[in-house]
Amino acid sequence: MYRDRRDIHHDLNANLYAIVKLPFGFEYQMNFTPRYHWYEYMNHESAEHPEWAGDGGRSERKNEKTFNWQVDNILRWKKEFGEDHRVEATFLQNAEKGQWWKTVAQNKLYSPSDILGFHNIGAGTAPSVSSEDTYKTGDALMGRLFYSFKDK
């Protein structure tokens, strides 16, 4: 076995909401949608393989976490006029936030041996470490008006 790899994704999603009927044909709905994702990637390529022997074995460990959420506030209004006319209006206000964290550790030229691979990534003599964080936010407004005559 020349390669040892672990590649695992975990996700946790939810959608929490409430709907409230209001007077005069109005209805309010709120949605909260969080998402949590974490990712583990570990890879080792053994020095016993002829292609990687010159690197003395090489390993990588990567960890990523993502947390996103969004909130929707929705107001709806429905009204019928006589038997032929129907009007519906929908208004939406949205807010969202996303955060992402990533750390990568790599190494090669293991001494005296690369037998522990990514389990002892510090045993290599050519380390490389990097990290990246991302933060984003957004908001939105939307409106929709619908008219129907005789349900057409």
Say what each PLM segment does.
Residues 1, 42-58, 101-129:
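Surface-exposed loop/turn segments flanking beta-strands in extracellular/periplasmic regions
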Residues 92-99:
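Glycine-rich, aromatic-flanked loop segments that form ligand/cofactor-binding clefts
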Residues 1-43, 60-80, 88, 130-152:
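Outer-membrane beta-barrel transmembrane strands
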